[in-house]
Design a protein with these regions (language model features):
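Acidic/histidine-rich helix-loop elements
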Residues: 48-59, 101-114, 142, 231
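Oxyanion-hole/transition-state-stabilizing segment in secreted/luminal serine hydrolases
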Residues: 83-85, 91-103, 114-152, 175-179
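Charged helix-capping and loop-helix junction motifs
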Residues: 147-156, 187-195
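N-terminal secretory targeting modules
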Residues: 1-83, 95
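A short helix->loop->beta-strand "cap" motif at the edges of active sites that frequently abuts
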Residues: 165-169
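Catalytic His-Asp segment of secreted/periplasmic serine-dependent ester chemistry enzymes
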Residues: 21, 177-252
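Hydrophobic positions in alpha-helices of CheY-like receiver
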Residues: 157-161
């Protein structure tokens, strides 16, 4: 069968016009069908893209963040809500359809990090949601924030949620592995260290910690290509794995 070549701009966060190296990925192991992805690596610097392009990229990221944040503020909310809170990996899923539950709400924003979560957390907890499933931190690493910064912000997120909505159940989901040969600032060794800290924090606060990393990793701790085309975000099969791993917590 003839290979199919498709050019796709993959964004670490939301939208950008800066594209870098192309990689060829086998889509169907039973055929020669493949796609060529134009990937935006984490190593974009002013040596690779001019300052104006990077400035426009950052402006687009911030605009997307505030557009989503303001949209969420306009939507109805109740104490029955089950919130999925995170970055683009959360943002890209249709959660209420996945669980066939209209109480499940997507509050992911592409490009978000732990600082962004803290900035908008009050808008989420003021309605006293039933549950919050959190996955955040991979972008912190891409933005060169330290592990201690990520961990400290998690503590603030947990404490702030408890202070404003003490009945809300908080579920800490591990950061997913990546293909760190492409996404070079998101080293899986660092992700593992963060996840170890998140598991410890969950014990300290008597929260449920959900180890998704182990479900998505290969033997060498990279994101299994069965679940992703770009080495960072998930495909449909990946979201089904995620759903099955947490279904009992959503339903409890």
């Amino acid at each position: 069968m003839k290979a199919v070549s498709i050019s796709v701009f993959m964004l670490t966060c939301c939208y950008t016009a800066i594209a870098q190296d192309a990689i060829n990925i086998l889509v169907d192991s039973s055929s020669s069908k493949s796609v060529t992805l134009t990937v935006l690596p984490d190593t974009v610097t002013t040596n690779e893209a001019n300052a104006k392009e990077l400035e426009e990229w950052n402006k687009a990221m911030r605009a997307y963040y505030y557009h989503r944040k303001e949209q969420f503020e306009m939507l109805p909310a109740s104490n029955k809500d089950i919130i999925f809170l995170g970055n683009s990996i959360t943002d890209q899923c249709e959660w209420h359809e996945l669980f066939n539950n209209m109480n499940v709400k997507n509050r992911g924003i592409g490009g978000d990090d732990t600082d962004g979560i803290l900035e908008r957390l009050g808008d989420i907890t003021k309605s006293k949601p039933s549950k919050i499933f959190i996955m955040i931190g991979t972008n912190d690493l891409a933005y060169s924030k330290t592990i201690s910064h990520i961990v400290e912000n998690y503590r603030k997120i947990i404490q702030s949620t408890r202070d404003s909505s003490p009945e809300t159940k908080i579920y800490i989901q591990s950061i997913l592995p990546t293909n760190d040969e492409i996404h070079t600032l998101r080293k899986n060794s660092d992700i593992i260290l963060v996840n170890q800290q998140l598991e410890q924090i969950s014990k300290e606060y008597s929260l449920t910690y959900i180890d998704l990393f182990s479900l998505f990793k290969t033997d060498n701790n990279k994101l299994n290509p069965e679940y992703s085309l770009d080495g960072l975000h998930l495909n449909g099969k990946g979201y089904m794995v995620w759903k099955n791993a947490i279904l009992k917590y959503v339903d409890e």
